[in-house]
Regions:
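Surface "functional belts" at beta-alpha junctions
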Residues: 1-97, 112, 126, 131
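Acyltransferase
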Residues: 89-145
């Protein structure tokens, strides 16, 4: 179950666009955009890592009310307050952390859709390289020049 999707699932049934924000450091956030209709969660923007400016621009383009949640809310609250042009709100603090119940419920939905895998085939899906990997690539690039 993708982490950002599971965080969004904490607000299952919301009438608003749901925007999870997980602090990825350096003004970046792990995020995505979701809504709920016809008894299911729909992905507007799949989970990704972007600069906070990029997700705010996308939200403003959508033109719909949005609710933010996640540990990135506290990090980016001032930026959101200054730059989001649509109606928005922040989820209650109790919704800002991963919940095993949301992961399990979303996992069941994915299983019913045939999107299951066995433990031997499971591999984590990293949205970006680790800092050590990025620094190694940078050094290798500098060495080639």
């Amino acid at each position: 179950v993708p982490t950002v999707d599971a965080l969004a699932y904490n607000l299952w049934g919301s009438a608003d666009v749901v925007c999870p924000l997980m602090d990825a450091r350096r003004q970046q956030t792990y995020t995505g955009l979701y809504d709920f209709a016809d008894g299911r969660m729909n992905t507007i923007l799949p989970q990704c890592v972007v600069m906070i400016e990029e997700i705010v621009d996308k939200i403003n383009e959508l033109g719909r009310r949005v609710i933010f949640l996640g540990d990135g809310v506290d990090v980016f609250r001032d930026y959101i307050n200054e730059h989001v042009k649509v109606d928005y709100d922040f989820a209650p603090a109790m919704c800002n952390k991963q919940r095993a119940s949301a992961v399990a419920c979303l996992g069941q939905v994915l299983y019913e859709q045939g999107r299951a895998e066995n433990a031997a085939d499971h591999k984590p899906e990293y949205l970006r390289l680790s800092q050590a990997e990025r620094e190694r690539q940078e050094k290798e690039r500098d060495f080639r020049i």
